[in-house]
Amino acid sequence: MTENRKKKVATVKTISKLIKNSAGLIVFEYQGLSASELESVRNDLKNHLANTMVFKNRFVKLAIDKAGFKELDSYLFGPNIFVFFDEEHKNATIKKIAEIEKKNKFVKIKAGIYEEKVVSDAEVRVIATLPTYEEALTILARSMLAPLQQVSLGLKMLVDEKHIKAE
């Protein structure tokens, strides 16, 4: 095997490991971004603990075919950034990518892998609207406390109007 071929095989293995070890992957197009804008996007995603990489589409196709996500092949054309993220930060990362897409007309979400399924760009945008784990817990806690707060407020109003005596 030639040296060049060995490097290519190693790259495909690296991509395969990234796919296997991450909770998901988002593919987005970045054609038209300047180098500084691209670096800014990568830094934003790095702050959300996402692994942002640029690979040849052919290498990614080989790796995703091996991983069983062949449906993603049709989205791999043009200049793409591949964002790998872990389970803990998946929703926050997807929200950040959607936010970047809204701010920058040159960034276009194409597709991704989320919870072991290939998802389209529209599905990625829907996922971005879902609350993060922490936000969901806050919503749950708030909804559980609301009835108790209403009872407490009602009792306080009765005491204030002297319908009942506070002891």
Swiss-Prot record:
One BP annotation, GO: translation
Keyword Transcription: no
Keywords: Ribonucleoprotein, Ribosomal protein, RNA-binding, rRNA-binding
GO molecular function: large ribosomal subunit rRNA binding
One Pfam family of this chain: Ribosomal_L10
Keyword Ribonucleoprotein included in the entry's annotation: yes
One Gene Ontology CC term in the entry: ribosome
Disulphide bridges, residue numbers: none
InterPro entries registered for this protein in UniProt: Ribosomal_uL10, Ribosomal_uL10-like_sf, Ribosomal_uL10_bac, Ribosomal_uL10_bac_type
PANTHER family in alphabetical order: 39S RIBOSOMAL PROTEIN L10, MITOCHONDRIAL
Function statement: Forms part of the ribosomal stalk, playing a central role in the interaction of the ribosome with GTP-bound translation factors.
Subunit structure of this chain's protein: Part of the ribosomal stalk of the 50S ribosomal subunit. The N-terminus interacts with L11 and the large rRNA to form the base of the stalk. The C-terminus forms an elongated spine to which L12 dimers bind in a sequential fashion forming a multimeric L10(L12)X complex.
Family assignment from sequence similarity: Belongs to the universal ribosomal protein uL10 family.
HAMAP family: Ribosomal_uL10 (MF_00362)
Protein name, per record: Large ribosomal subunit protein uL10
Species annotation: Mycoplasma mobile (strain ATCC 43663 / 163K / NCTC 11711) (Mesomycoplasma mobile)
GN (gene name): rplJ
